[in-house]
Amino acid sequence: MKVKILRYHAIANWTWDTPKDDVCGICRVPFDGCCPQCTSPGDNCPIVWGKCKHIFHAHCIQNWLATSGSQGQCPMDRQTFVVADSTNEKSETQ
């Protein structure tokens, strides 16, 4: 028996590789949503891992670091915030 496919409508779902129900430490919005500056999640609203292992929306941490009171520190642990290399850091944590 042969089956001929006439149409195919694929549906996909994506999520960030973050702990379940985790939220941005600055805006308190889940990572599967978008930060207050953005209108849609995904490429327009990426997330950033710090070497300290804290995760933020890119826009949120950029705005935080731009304030004079932040002194370039992570808002969660006050270490100097440095963006982690995504390939090396992700393999170390797995």
From Swiss-Prot:
Q: Where are the zinc fingers (RING-type)?
A: 35-78
Instruction: Give the species this sequence originates from.
Output: Schizosaccharomyces pombe (strain 972 / ATCC 24843) (Fission yeast)
Per UniProt, the keywords (alphabetical) are: Cell cycle, Cell division, Metal-binding, Mitosis, Ubl conjugation pathway, Zinc, Zinc-finger
What is the primary gene name for this protein? apc11
Assembly mode: The APC/C is composed of at least 13 subunits: apc1, apc2, nuc2, apc4, apc5, cut9, apc8, apc10, apc11, hcn1, apc13, apc14 and apc15.
Q: Which GO terms describe its cellular component?
A: anaphase-promoting complex; nucleus
In its UniProt entry, what is this protein called?
Anaphase-promoting complex subunit 11
User: What's the superkingdom here?
Assistant: Eukaryota
Cross-referenced Gene3D superfamilies: Zinc/RING finger domain, C3HC4 (zinc finger)
